[in-house]
Amino acid sequence: NKLDAVGDDAATAFGHIRSALEKFAKEAGIEVTAIVPISALKGHNVVEAAERGWCGYSGASLLDILEALPVTPADTALPFAFPVQWVEKFSSSADTSQGRRIFWGRVANGVATVGQQVKVLPSGQTATVAQVLGTTRKPGTVQAGHSAGVVLDREVDVSRGDWLLALVPPAQAAITSDDDFSDTPTATSLPPSRELSATVAWMDDEPLVAGRVYWALHGHRWVKARVKRVVHRLAINTLAEEAADSLSANSIGHIELLLQEPIAAMPFEASRVLGSLVLVDTATHRTAGAVLVRANH
């Protein structure tokens, strides 16, 4: 923006900026769709393309490029995962003629469908989806990214913060080494984990150090999380990984977390909802860090 203020050297300035951005994006692993010189003051390349050749650029306007970008598909191809946000207890609504509870939330992964077998985390109880409610009341299916109400075929212990996870058919289920979740016929397609490798953007004035304990919010569930190790700090200007034993405010780094209870986490690249957490200071209740899961163990 503001390249009109450069005057006759706008093309040269834009060339330098474009080269620097392309280099940075390559090092950071960011795919660049377009780099557009604009002038908000004069409207160049914002809604309509500027005069051909302005700043040495002859491509489309910013608005045209944004409108042509593909919409990021919802995570419908992933196994069903549903964080429970609210429990409507023993509804007398006509939508649930048997008076069962409705579990409301937004589908994180997959598709909510009638007949889907699920396992409740953390209780481990299993059930089958009997009804799916949505904005059209009884749509039958609700895809990831949309809000839904789920009614199960039997009464199980489900509260706000719990997760409903798709079950793997017995023939596909693999026996895990985790005693708490090794029941093959009811194994979930997303094995819960207590240990996470993650990238954190640290926002608290109190530095992040190994051994500190925080509240971690995953979906709508709160669990205690201990910082097992600070692996490295990311140098913002060079993207180099620097050795570090702590992270100060506004730092980004790689850490390892040990959770008090298992959660259904997966890498952020695969699922935005299941791959993100928020760390909160247990004493001050300040939001301390934003976490992107890289791997679970």
Protein language model regions, located:
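Polyanion-binding loop/helix "lid" in catalytic or ligand-binding cores
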Residues: 84
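A generic structural signal for short coil/turn motifs at secondary-structure boundaries
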Residues: 5-10, 45-47, 93, 138, ...
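Residues that form ligand- and interface-recognition hot spots within folded domains
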Residues: 88
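C-terminal effector/interaction modules appended to NTPase cores
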Residues: 91-297
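Active-site glycine-centered loops adjacent to acidic/histidine catalytic or metal-binding residues
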Residues: 1, 39, 115
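Short, solvent-exposed loop/turn segments at secondary-structure junctions
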Residues: 3-7, 234-236
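Canonical P-loop GTPase G-domain recognition
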Residues: 6-79
